[in-house]
């Protein structure tokens, strides 16, 4: 498989990276792409963790707003929503 890079700037960057790391251009591109993908994976995990933490905080905030009677009513109605296996009816 081949890759045709038409950007002179990109070619120059790849050559510089290869020279500075002591590798060939293919290895330099492979390493750079692998590092960027790894960085994106870390960012995705961080965003997912932030969303999860925000959702948990929202649930904690909601829990503080509900009275004990409200919570009992919710639990009573949950029984109607799920069967004995915990699956939705």
Swiss-Prot record:
Pfam families: PSK_trans_fac. InterPro entries: VapB-like. Keywords: Toxin-antitoxin system. Possibly the antitoxin component of a type II toxin-antitoxin (TA) system. Its cognate toxin is VapC42 (Potential). This is Putative antitoxin VapB42.
């Amino acid at each position: 498989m081949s890759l045709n890079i038409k950007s002179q700037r990109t070619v120059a960057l790849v050559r510089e990276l290869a020279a500075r790391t002591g590798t060939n251009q293919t290895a330099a591109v492979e390493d750079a792409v692998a590092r960027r993908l790894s960085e994106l994976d870390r960012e995705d995990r961080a965003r997912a963790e932030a969303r999860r933490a925000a959702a948990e905080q929202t649930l904690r905030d909601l829990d503080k707003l509900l009275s004990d009677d409200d919570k009992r009513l919710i639990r009573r109605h949950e029984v109607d929503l799920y069967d004995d296996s915990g699956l939705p009816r």
